[in-house]
Amino acid sequence: MRAVCVFVLACVAVSGAPGVRGQDGPAEEELFQRAEDLLLRSILTQMEEQNSENDQPEWMEKRQHPGKRQHPGKREEDLEPEVEMERWRRQHPGKRAPLDLGMLEDPTALSELSKRQHPGKRYLMLLHKRQHPGRRELQEADGDSAELEKRQHPGKRRCEGWADAGCGLLELLDTSGAPEKRQHPGRRAELEDELPGLE
């Protein structure tokens, strides 16, 4: 574009030079001067408009974050799946919406997901609820009973089969009228160390 401007200026300068055609009247000279000024102004305004139109979007694109600083009406409603996947991968793992889990219908599962969890224990709450060891219900008699007995307090194990009634009677006879005192775990260890010395 600048080459065209220089070429036009050279043509006007050569055609308006007094030595080329001889002495023209002052009216023609004034006419050529006005034409030259108008031509230069129009070319300069066109160049400024093109530069301002081209520079502004590049400047705005450099400044903008892909999901930010856009007018709400100009945001793309239908994002491509690749763009959506990229946005999902860039999110913090704790903030990701677990859309692929089919357990969101359960309100307790949804509330458990909103809590912060250790990374190795994520989503375990969805599979089973935590319960007090003494109040757990057996879901399967085979596999869960061994695990349940391992995790319960040794004195609170459940009896299986026909011995349930006998265990209930033994528990009633075992408990005295006074409630059992609980001790701090550290105190219990001290007492155990002292017992062998007493014998």
From Swiss-Prot:
Disulphide bonds in the chain: none
Any Pfam family: TRH
Any GO MF annotation of the entry: thyrotropin-releasing hormone activity
InterPro entries linked: TRH (IPR008857)
Chain residue ranges for the region called Disordered: 48-90, 129-160, 175-199
Modified sites of kind Pyrrolidone carboxylic acid: Q64, Q70, Q91, Q117, Q131, Q152, Q183
Signal peptide: 1-22
Entry keywords, A to Z: Amidation, Cleavage on pair of basic residues, Hormone, Pyrrolidone carboxylic acid, Repeat, Secreted, Signal
Transmembrane regions listed in the UniProt entry: none
Residue positions, PTM Proline amide: P66, P72, P93, P119, P133, P154, P185
One BP term from GO: eating behavior
Comp. bias (Basic and acidic residues): 147-160, 179-190
Family: Belongs to the TRH family.
Record's function text: Functions as a regulator of the biosynthesis of TSH in the anterior pituitary gland and as a neurotransmitter/ neuromodulator in the central and peripheral nervous systems.
Protein name per Swiss-Prot or TrEMBL: Pro-thyrotropin-releasing hormone
Organism: Danio rerio (Zebrafish)
Organism lineage: Eukaryota, Metazoa, Chordata, Craniata, Vertebrata
